[in-house]
Structure formats: structure tokens, C-alpha cells
Amino acid sequence: MTNARQIALELLNRVRASESYINLLLPKELAKHEISDADRGLVQELSYGVLRWQLQYDAIIDHLTPGKTLSPGLRAAIQLGLHQLFRMRVPTHAAINETVDLVKRFETSAAGLSNAVLRNAERAGHENLLALLTEGQDDLTRLSIEYSHPKWIISGMKSALELDGRSSDLSELLSANNQTPVVNLIAITSAAAVELEALGLERGTASPNGFLCIGNPLEYLSIPGVRVQDQGSQLVALAMSKVSDKAGTWLDMCSGPGGKAAVLEHAVSESGNLVCYEPHVKRAKLVTSALRDPESTSVLVKRGQDAPESTFAAILLDAPCAGLGSLRRKPESRWTKTPEQLPSLTKLQAELIDAAVLALEPGGMLMYATCSPLVIETNAQIRAALDRHANMSLVDLVPVLQELSPGLELNTTRKTVQLWPHKDGTDAMFMALLKKDEGN
């Protein structure tokens, strides 16, 4: 029988070989095996945990194996062992012996090496190893090892925090990125909220429509109007719904996989219409399946930056981005994303903004959002857009969010909104609201 550690190793190898998302691969992999709920939890903790702490574990492995080249599979297996030793309540003998047995299955000659590395790591102790690895290092290198983030991401987060008046929060943010997030549900309708409350679910702290999931989220998705959605994403759609003309036609410009579209659909259901663009066929199908009444909403397989077929009273541009705001849920992103990808992303974001401005009716609202706090994708992008489009103005979004969620600690000196996992318990969503002049 395949055990939990072997499944976790296979998952890690697949994620790294194909640059896939662990949250997509994990359910499919678990469905192939008949294992207990406890082992399912073990697979999840091992795979997510190692992906989060990969850089730190690699630094420890390299320190304990100077001059040696390890195969990817062997390195992954030792990472699993280190995670059990240092961050799980697994007995030392079990963490080491199970790892050695795992290595014997695919690289017998390396069993002794894996045993030696783990025993030396256990003898040295986690804190002592970190002290050795960070001694004499600059702050950026120290933070990179301590919190297992690439240096370029730490620098980007630092700049974003400084702009938001939170320059002292860097360590707290990096730590939050390594925490396991609570699964959040959204009750799109009041009837759905009543059902979730009757089941004993607690309200979320950030979104007025949010609930904290208990157990398997699939158990709640049969309730009409209930979706799995981070509270930050909920607030994007709810804020747009609050400020836009509900009698008009709205556009969700980059709508896949459909979570925000479902919220917008409900907002315009009485007197307006919703159109959804999504360039990828599979994701467009996900949008359709997320809608309550797909026949009343046009889901078009279309690129947002292409010439619009009509004009809209309100547009949501949830732009493609580096995705660094969701590192809690997608830990592998810190290793698959690179700074070299940013120029093409920011170019696409600018093209999408320009297309959205063209497609807006006079007086129309454009909600720009990213699941990334990087300044180049957020405030810098908005400043550049306002420079290009004299007929657009920035609307103060802070009062809108404060009315939706009075408990949020927002920076009231700026008109845009940046959410943070360590402060708000959400993904690091950015939002900006722009309005087109009435005469243009």
C-alpha cells in the first residue's frame, strides 16, 4: 500500500517538474488512494509544508552535505524528513526511519546519506542550524532563510509595505505567508447566509458575506449561493457591486474561474446584465458553472485586451498578475514566479486597462484588482493609467471598504486599498476604483 509520505513525495516531484499548483494536484492525487483521513491530513501538511519551507530546508541540506550533488527526488525526501523533525509532532525515530525507508524505494545507495543528514540535523537542532546559516548575513539574506522567501519577493513586499505605511510589518507578513489559511466561504445570497449560520459556521472578520469553513468545504457547496472564496476576493466584487449602477451592463473582463462573476451576477440580477470575458476555454467553462443562471449571463471566450463589442456601465478588471498575494494558499508560487516575468505581466495589465477605459460608458466605473501587492503591478500601474487617460479619475475606495467591513485597518491617507494576510486575514489583494468623466 502507498503510504502518506510516498504520496507527498510524488506530489512534490510532480509540482516541481511541471510547475503545477499543489491545490489542484492534491485532490486528484488523494482520490487515487484509499487512505485514512489522518493520512490525508498528513499528505497535505507534508506537501504544503515542504513547499513553504523549501529554501530553508535546502540551506540546511546544503550545509550538511558540502560538495555533494543530490538528485531532486533525494532532496525532496530529505526535505520531508526535516519538516517532520522540525515542524511536526512526529517522533524522531519515525521521522528518520520512515524517510530512509522511502529513499530505499527509489535510490537505495542514498539511504545512508539521508540517514546521516537527518540525524545530524536532529543533533544540531533547528534553532542552532538557523543561527549558523544566518550568522554574518545581511538582513535580506537572513530574512530569506528564516522565512523561506526569495530575496526579490522580500524586497517587493518591503516596498509595498512602506508605501502602505507599514514598514515595520515585514517579518509579520513573511510569517503570515507561511501559515495555513482558513478556508473561506461566501454566502452570495441572504438565504445562503441563513443556512450557513444554522450549520454553526462563524462569520468571517473581513467580508460581510464571508464564513469560516468547518471541515470539508465540499459539504457546503450544495447550498445554493455558497462558494469557496478568499475574503479579499469577496471584498473586490462586493465593493464594485456597491458603487456601480446596477441597472446597467457590467463586464467581468478576466473572469476565470468565476468566483467574482458569481457575486456580480447576483448584484445585477434584478435590473442589469453581466458579460464575462475569459480567453481560455476550460476556464470559461468554470465561469459558466459558477453562475447561478448561466443563460442570463454571456460568457465569451475572448481576450480582455481585444476591441470591445459594446460599452459597459461598470467593468471589473481582476488582472493577471504575479499572484504573490496568495502565497499562503499557493506556496509553490514563490519558487515558480520570477522577476523576469514582471515586464510582460505589467505590459498586459496596461493593455487591459486601456481596453477597459475604451469600453466604459461615460460616468462608468472601473475596478482594477490584483492578487499581488507589488507596487509595479498596483499603485504604479494606476498612476501610469491616469497619466495616459485624462478622462479617468481615481475614486476614494477606502470609505467603501470601511462601510463594508468596519474592522479593517486601512491606510486612510490613500484612495486605493491594499489588504494584507497578517492584518486582515485575507490574500494580499489590491483594489483601485477609477471613474470615467461624464462627457467622455
Please report, for each region that a protein language model flagged, where it lies by residue.
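S-adenosylmethionine
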Residues: 1-440
